[in-house]
């Protein structure tokens, strides 16, 4: 197996920016929700529920129900436009149906909040906030962990224990993080 890193390291500024990005991805949606619910929402009744309904709908529709259909996308991996179109349609259908049902649920369970201008904001903050936390911070966490492995000199050992089917994807990430051409 060829050596991937060749004494390359991930710069300290890149590692610092990863940590800042992770902090933003975690703190921004939660901080905004707390601020809106405590300071802005009138009446406060139902505001927290709306935020968590948004989170729940994202988790259910994008995280669980959409999952089985992602396997079909592998058929389109070698055709970028079809892969992008399928992914966009899949996300669009599941997330929009989820939003529709989420607002129907709010309309039925918290009817006095349905016309409140903060309702769609709080719902979107829950929906997008969970996406930001799960997708944004977890991606950065993965890159951060790879950076730590690279900088400690342990990445070659990890790659040697990695199944061949995953090795090329990890090698591409390593090369991207170290600034080497992929």
Model-identified regions with their sequence ranges:
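Hydrophobic alpha-helical segments at protein termini of multi-pass membrane proteins
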Residues: 2-182
């Amino acid at each position: 197996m060829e050596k991937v890193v060749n004494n390359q390291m991930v710069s300290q500024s890149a590692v610092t920016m990863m940590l800042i990005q992770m902090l933003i991805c975690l703190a921004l949606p939660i901080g905004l929700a707390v601020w809106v619910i405590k300071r802005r929402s009138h009446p406060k009744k139902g505001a927290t529920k709306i935020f968590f309904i948004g989170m729940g709908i994202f988790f259910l529709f994008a995280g669980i129900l959409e999952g089985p259909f992602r396997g079909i996308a592998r058929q389109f991996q070698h055709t970028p436009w079809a892969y992008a179109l399928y992914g966009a349609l899949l996300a669009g259908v599941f997330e929009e149906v989820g939003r529709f049902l989420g607002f129907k649920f709010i309309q039925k369970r918290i009817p006095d909040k349905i016309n409140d201008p903060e309702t769609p904001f709080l719902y979107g903050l829950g929906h997008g906030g969970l996406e930001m936390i799960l997708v944004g911070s977890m991606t950065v966490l993965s890159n951060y962990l790879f950076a730590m492995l690279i900088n400690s000199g342990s990445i070659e050992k990890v790659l040697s224990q990695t199944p061949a089917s995953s090795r090329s994807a990890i090698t591409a990430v390593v090369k991207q993080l170290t600034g080497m051409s992929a």
